[in-house]
Regions:
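N-terminal soluble domains immediately following signal/targeting peptides that reside
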Residues: 14-158
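Sec-dependent N-terminal signal peptides
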Residues: 3-11
């Protein structure tokens, strides 16, 4: 019992910082569908620090103010290349699920995918121990990697 308490206490004193990014190639629509799960309090703190504004990501009334800030932040910290060509991410929006913000993006008009390169340094400036998990699925073939700060780039071949 004491061991469980101490383990829980240590976990509380040493929080972990992780995000998860899913990139799925939709063969039907010829697009990349991207979702990124980030703890909303960490995302909110990063946006406040970067833009010097007091924000509340949980208030729907602030969505109009937050969407452009989240878009700009993700454009800077999450970048993709497909078949050695950089692609532009189109921000679709975000939603809150429990303690996380799910941010949605897409890249339209993506034909055959042979290779995807990703740079993901989301929250690296905020947390030295930030880890960004990346999962990429093309034609049902799922590949994954873990990017530990400062390592921010990975390449996947299909």
């Amino acid at each position: 019992m004491l061991h469980l308490f101490l383990t829980s206490l240590l976990a509380f004193l040493h929080p972990f910082f992780v995000s998860v990014t899913e990139v799925n190639h939709n063969d039907k629509t010829k697009s990349l569908e991207i979702s990124t799960k980030i703890f909303f309090n960490d995302l909110e703190a990063a946006l406040e620090k970067h833009y010097q504004k007091q924000l509340d990501i949980l208030k729907p009334a602030q969505r109009e103010q937050l969407d452009p800030l989240i878009n700009e932040y993700l454009q800077k910290h999450l970048q993709l290349s497909v078949n050695d060509k950089p692609v532009k991410l189109k921000y679709l929006g975000y939603e809150i699920e429990q303690d996380a913000a799910w941010c949605y993006l897409e890249v339209p008009q993506v034909g055959r995918v042979k290779q995807i390169e990703i740079r993901n340094d989301v929250l690296f400036a905020e947390h030295d121990s930030q880890t960004n998990m990346v999962h990429i699925t093309v034609k049902g073939n799922r590949k994954s990697t873990k990017l530990d700060n400062p390592e921010s780039q990975a390449s996947f071949s299909f």
